[in-house]
Amino acid sequence: MLDREGYRPNVGIVLLNSRNEVFWGKRVGQHSWQFPQGGIQHGESPEQAMYRELHEEVGLLPEHVQIIGRTRDWLRYDVPEEYLRRQHATRVHRAAYRGQKQIWFLLRLVGLDSDIQLRASEHPEFDAWRWVPFWIQLDAVIGFKREVYELALSELARYLSRGVRMHQLAWGSPLDLLQSFYSKGEEGSPESSKTDKSK
């Protein structure tokens, strides 16, 4: 389902723990990390899509989380043509499809870490996860999504405590933060990552 401009409606999820750290998932078989996200199906509201994607990708139910806030409007990113070719998209789809437009939700985990299950669906999105600081360096995110991630985090930060917001002002852009985050262990497979133990 595309809009008139060729963007697919989508939701993104920033999941917080009690320390205001965020869920960071490693994509199956890849070295890239990202937040949970997924398309909005026909007839779904953004909130309904968010809960469905939350369960499919992270294994959490509505009772495991609290909605803190969401972005005011859609945030968009374009998918490069070369990426679409690698994904074997059809010519018709490539001609119409430009990228994603996303509503981002900020959630608080009120359940336990053990409630997170990466194999809740038949086609898992992630094979490892970890908690990371809110202003995570975005080098491990695929390039064309980084600007939207920065915009989403910057807008959602208004819902957090003053201390976390002031951290943004002190350090500047999230892209400049935590330069040594992936210096421990091999990049893309941090030693402290939590893997899916149900395999």
Curated annotation (Swiss-Prot):
<dbReference type="InterPro" id="IPR000086">
    <property type="entry name" value="NUDIX_hydrolase_dom"/>
</dbReference>
<keyword id="KW-0378">Hydrolase</keyword>
<feature type="domain" description="Nudix hydrolase">
    <location>
        <begin position="6"/>
        <end position="154"/>
    </location>
</feature>
<protein>
    <recommendedName>
        <fullName>RNA pyrophosphohydrolase</fullName>
        <ecNumber>3.6.1.-</ecNumber>
    </recommendedName>
</protein>
<dbReference type="InterPro" id="IPR015797">
    <property type="entry name" value="NUDIX_hydrolase-like_dom_sf"/>
</dbReference>
<dbReference type="GO" id="GO:0006402">
    <property type="term" value="P:mRNA catabolic process"/>
</dbReference>
<dbReference type="InterPro" id="IPR020084">
    <property type="entry name" value="NUDIX_hydrolase_CS"/>
</dbReference>
<feature type="short sequence motif" description="Nudix box">
    <location>
        <begin position="38"/>
        <end position="59"/>
    </location>
</feature>
<dbReference type="Pfam" id="PF00293">
    <property type="entry name" value="NUDIX"/>
</dbReference>
<comment type="function">
    <text>Accelerates the degradation of transcripts by removing pyrophosphate from the 5'-end of triphosphorylated RNA, leading to a more labile monophosphorylated state that can stimulate subsequent ribonuclease cleavage.</text>
</comment>
<comment type="similarity">
    <text>Belongs to the Nudix hydrolase family. RppH subfamily.</text>
</comment>
<dbReference type="GO" id="GO:0034353">
    <property type="term" value="F:mRNA 5'-diphosphatase activity"/>
</dbReference>
<dbReference type="InterPro" id="IPR022927">
    <property type="entry name" value="RppH"/>
</dbReference>
<dbReference type="InterPro" id="IPR020476">
    <property type="entry name" value="Nudix_hydrolase"/>
</dbReference>
<dbReference type="GO" id="GO:0005737">
    <property type="term" value="C:cytoplasm"/>
</dbReference>
